[in-house]
C-alpha cells in the first residue's frame, strides 16, 4: 500500500502545484509489535522525525493537518478513555527540538468543509497509512473500527439533538 499512498500524495501535490519531497521511515515497522499504546508511540516518533527533517531542511516549523473535528474527538477520547481533560493546541513550541514549532493551520476548520473542498477540487486523500488500520478485520481496512471512529459517531449522534455539541466540547477546554 505504501506506493499507492505515495502516488496519491504526489498526485494531489501536483494538482495543487505544491512542491513536495517524500521521506521514507521505518517507524511503522518499529511500532507494529508494540502492544501498549502503539498509536501514541507512533505519533510521537513520527512527530520527532518531522521535526528532525524540518530542521535538516532549514525550517523552524512543522504543520500538521489536525482540524476542528480532530480536536473535539481528542478531547472526548481523553475524557472517556484517559480520565483526563486536555486539548490540542493550534501552536506549540517543541520541548525536544529547541527553536522548533508545531502549527495546526486547520484547527478551526470543520472536517466536512475539508471534504467538500477536496471533492470540489477532485482531490483524493489517503486514510491512516498504518498497519493497524490496514489489518483491522472489524473495520475492513479503514479507521471505522477505532475508538476515534466510535467517538466521532457519538458526537455526530449528539449533534443531531443539539447542533451546539461540537462547539460546546471545543469551548469546554478554552
Describe each region flagged by the PLM.
Residues 2-85, 89, 112-120:
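ATP-dependent adenylation/nucleotidyltransferase module used to activate substrates
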Residues 22-23, 64, 127-130, 135, ...:
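Residue-level detector of family-conserved "landmark" positions at structurally sensitive sites
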Residues 41, 63, 105, 109, ...:
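A short glycine-/small-residue-rich loop at the edge of a beta-strand within enzyme catalytic domains
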Residues 45, 146, 164:
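Conserved active-site and cofactor/substrate-binding residues in soluble primary-metabolism enzymes
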Residues 69-155:
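Catalytic subdomain that performs nucleotidyl-dependent activation
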Residues 150-174:
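An accessory alpha-helical subdomain
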